């Protein structure tokens, strides 16, 4: 399935879904860290779609959900753009922004894939609802929306939900779950590889199992990669740092295996926050990880 002839780079400079502002500067930081040069060295044809126009803050009010209407507007526009990219047989590579933009990414993909597999690389499960979320930040609900968990206006964005199926989803790198999320993961049958599982099985076995799950009966596989899946010592520039994450080599190895599978049909990299970074270290790492997904090798 992967790779199509062209990679379409879509920047989404949007950070209202996160608890701390700054991730809206992530796409530019990733570009500044040498993304185009890296892709050029890989001789990959790249179409730069430019930044998606993001809504201005207009004091939307919702009793529990922060920036609810801005997030609906943003993801409605993002879904249309992602759908357009897929329709041209190009590979959508979405650069966030916070993880609430995943709602628009898979909403656009769902207009072309009826049984989408999803690899959710993240310290968190992002399966909260307006009732279970301790913060009201929608970046912690983005996967849940795809499964039909959440307010109708979010789940009814064209293609947004409920369009994903629990049996087609794999969480990797998880290490902080709220009580409601634990319960939902157990009851729904979503496969979750926590850091404990990675320690016990090794990343190679985890990825073998993960790829087996997301390619079984699916017609496409989307990678949603939150940079906070890595250990904060490797990736300090992100808003919700949880110690004890995926190592530098584990992350690269996982992405190299995804490239070798030739099954990934779209990807997004989110939650790079340059205002919290150390010398653009996290943005540079993100460029390297994207390169591993797209075929960069040591030899």
Give the ranges of each region predicted by the language model.
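Short, structured patches in soluble enzyme cores that scaffold and shape functional sites
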Residues: 120-123, 147, 168, 173-176, ...
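Active-site metal-binding loops of divalent metal-dependent hydrolases
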Residues: 14, 98-99, 123, 174-175, ...
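Short active-site oxyanion
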Residues: 90-92, 166-170
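Solvent-exposed alpha-helices and their adjacent loops that cap or buttress functional pockets
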Residues: 2-3, 111-113, 135-137, 158-164, ...
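A general structural motif
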Residues: 150-154, 172-178, 205-206, 247-252
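Active-site histidine-anchored catalytic micro-motif
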Residues: 91-156, 261-262
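Catalytic cores of soluble, metal-dependent hydrolases
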Residues: 4-14, 20-93, 105, 111, ...
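Aromatic-lined glycan-binding groove of carbohydrate-active enzymes
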Residues: 166-168, 175-180, 217-221
